[in-house]
């Protein structure tokens, strides 16, 4: 809700759409956002590129502004800066993350429907289908632009991917209550005056999650709670499995398995 509220202050965004999955466990979120009078689109759980593409087909935008749900501190002024940069250029894709100079958690991507259409039709790797814009950024077929801040704050972590992140961001919002539409510069000032608030997640790397597939993320979680990451494998997984990442399954029966 706070993310949507902050985004609603943008002067360059015409419509805000929550693009989530059609899984039943997402229904409470869908119902809640619908009550807030925002548009909701439901699509594929794993093929997020497909979800974005079909949402774009429904709403027919000239360009898409992508903000991920792990960025509750997103600043509408930064969003507007990136959107204006896209409008003033002839780029297919503009972001503020290539390379990053803003804190992790203030990520903005803007791209044309044409680029999205090409990615949808041409991207084949599961990783590219999951992370939506990697094909646009890395295929070499599109003109790419970037918005850089005058000072590099890319080492700051304001995203919410891990429990430690949640505690940091929760403390930030608590500090500013009852206001929820404070600026990123105010958060920077808080960082300088009360650094202890931000110390809990400083050991985590920027964008670590975005470079991983689902199986890799599960392996990281497993290693934190299970000695060696597994309790059932007869051999060390690092010796045999591709890229040293085992597979995890939600259930198995006989010779059949269901991948997570």
For each of these PLM feature ranges, what is it?
Residues 1-62:
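Conserved N-terminal catalytic core of the sugar/cofactor nucleotidyltransferase
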Residues 61, 108-120, 163-167:
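Conserved nucleotide-sugar donor-binding
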Residues 63-67:
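Short aromatic-hydrophobic micro-motifs that form the base-stacking/packing surface
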Residues 111, 131-211:
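Conserved alpha/beta core of the MobA/IspD/sugar-nucleotide pyrophosphorylase nucleotidyltransferase superfamily
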Residues 48-54, 58, 68-85:
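Acidic donor-binding/catalytic loop of UDP-sugar-dependent glycosyltransferases
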Residues 75-101:
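Conserved donor-nucleotide/metal-binding helix-loop-beta segment in metal-dependent transferases, i.e.
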Residues 212-260:
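N-terminal glycine-rich, Lys/His-bearing helix-loop that initiates the first secondary-structure elements
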